[in-house]
Amino acid sequence: MQILLANPRGFCAGVDRAISIVERALELFGTPIYVRHEVVHNRYVVNGLRERGAIFIEQIEDVPDGAILIFSAHGVSQAVRNEAKNRDLTVFDATCPLVTKVHMEVARASKKGVEAILIGHAGHPEVEGTMGQYSNADGGMYLVESPDDVWQLQVKDEKNLCFMTQTTLSVDDTYAVIDALRERFPRIIGPRKDDICYATTNRQEAVRHLSDKADVVFVVGSKNSSNSNRLAELAQRAGKAAYLIDSADDIQESWLTGASYVGVTAGASAPDILVQQVIQRLKELGGKVAVEMQGREENIVFEVPKELRVEVKQID
């Protein structure tokens, strides 16, 4: 049984930055550090930070006065940002810069009174944060998930519309929704550059290549990770058995029955240590040396805030 590794896989620059922000805050200021929502959607990462003193909350009211608060990589609404400011909390923003780009698109639309349509999944924190950038009562902000949603959507002015997307969507599904938007609203304006982030696009391309060869595909990622779920769906659409797993412990030996090639990839919020543990487990079940597939090279780095770049020894 040959083990094939998708390339690229695992951490993206935005996730790496968000985790580093929490780690640096803990090093510089000690515990507790409060984080609004899971900083990234991965159980292993969140549990590790929790053990080091991070406290994950959903409501700003749960943060004591004068405490340090970190916004997650998914971003927050302006209402949440304003609430933190009014509470005089020390805030470090771990919002992925590529999510911030979409926030700015929405804010510009709101300022101009242009109605905005967001393609995304209802209830996802990134969507909630992005929708929360729009405040113009004379305009409108709408959420669609499918072409059917587009055809049922009612707007105020079909000639004054723009759209943007959640950063972690299925590329294929999103293009189908965009096609419907352009057909329904011919004058709609899209972003100058695709909102789906480079890491999402690259990992989806990699899992397609992986699915061409693998009989079964394991996607390392947590159930609440949007981009990890999309990877598993892509492999399934390719006709392959695909399993979204948090760790090697989730692997059932029966899933490997009859498999000659086993593919492994990881969502953008899954650390490499989990992938290595999966590889080790597959070897125990008869897998050979893991082979890296060819893929796109990623060298993007997002810096942490300058306030967190100081040496620990400078803090008394």
Swiss-Prot record:
(2E)-4-hydroxy-3-methylbut-2-enyl diphosphate binds at residues 41, 74, 124, 167, 225-227, 269. Pathway: Isoprenoid biosynthesis; dimethylallyl diphosphate biosynthesis; dimethylallyl diphosphate from (2E)-4-hydroxy-3-methylbutenyl diphosphate: step 1/1; Isoprenoid biosynthesis; isopentenyl diphosphate biosynthesis via DXP pathway; isopentenyl diphosphate from 1-deoxy-D-xylulose 5-phosphate: step 6/6. The keyword Lyase does not apply. It holds the Pfam family LYTB. It catalyses: isopentenyl diphosphate + 2 oxidized [2Fe-2S]-[ferredoxin] + H2O = (2E)-4-hydroxy-3-methylbut-2-enyl diphosphate + 2 reduced [2Fe-2S]-[ferredoxin] + 2 H(+); dimethylallyl diphosphate + 2 oxidized [2Fe-2S]-[ferredoxin] + H2O = (2E)-4-hydroxy-3-methylbut-2-enyl diphosphate + 2 reduced [2Fe-2S]-[ferredoxin] + 2 H(+). The keyword Oxidoreductase applies. Its cofactor is [4Fe-4S] cluster. Dimethylallyl diphosphate binds at residues 41, 74, 124, 225-227, 269. Its EC number is 1.17.7.4. Catalyzes the conversion of 1-hydroxy-2-methyl-2-(E)-butenyl 4-diphosphate (HMBPP) into a mixture of isopentenyl diphosphate (IPP) and dimethylallyl diphosphate (DMAPP). Acts in the terminal step of the DOXP/MEP pathway for isoprenoid precursor biosynthesis. Belongs to the IspH family. Homodimer. This is 4-hydroxy-3-methylbut-2-enyl diphosphate reductase. It comes from Pectobacterium atrosepticum (strain SCRI 1043 / ATCC BAA-672).
